[in-house]
Amino acid sequence: DEVRMAMNVPMIDMRSAEYPKLTLPIFEDLKKVFKMKDGRVFIFPSSGTGAWESAIQNTLKPGDKVLMSRFGQFSLLWVDMAERLGLKVELCDEEWGTGVPLEKYADILAKDKAHEIKAVFATHNETATGVTSDIAGVRKALDAAKHPALLFVDSVSGVGSLDMRMGEWGVDCCVSGSCPSSWPILWSPGSCSG
């Protein structure tokens, strides 16, 4: 009853002076969840799919080459979206239930001496198959190749239930969602750089 009664308050208008007082502390608290010190958190009023689209459209442009893998339903949807938005996808098509192919990513990035690949995409937790991918391993592949590509992570069903170390792992943009892992939909750091 105590929790129910605490929620029994009038709605706050999002344009009122009270609204920022309520929401601004959330941004700093969410940085702790993502284990990040730098960068920005954006609370985005959409599904995880809407946040993916916004992240892609605000950081990349049609014709940009990206490295992606497909190994489950949500990585499949992310690849489809990238292609619909005009990105040139270098695809590692993997058996469902396997995760991000780190060795293939490392090989492709090492061979990309001209740095044509602008972003590397990794699905952190593939809900459809229950597979968790090694995001730190993707960063190691980028670093070993001395590759400047941005690292995008789909963690819609991961953040809040799996470890996410944006700062330590050098994640440039992470999309999470409220439903699968109980956190607000957001996107974060460095996603507007480069």
Q: Whereabouts are the PLM-identified features?
A:
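A glycine-/small-polar-enriched, mobile loop at the entrance of the PLP active site in fold-type I
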Residues: 1-44, 49
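Conserved PLP-enzyme active-site core in the AAT-like
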Residues: 25-29, 38, 43, 47-194
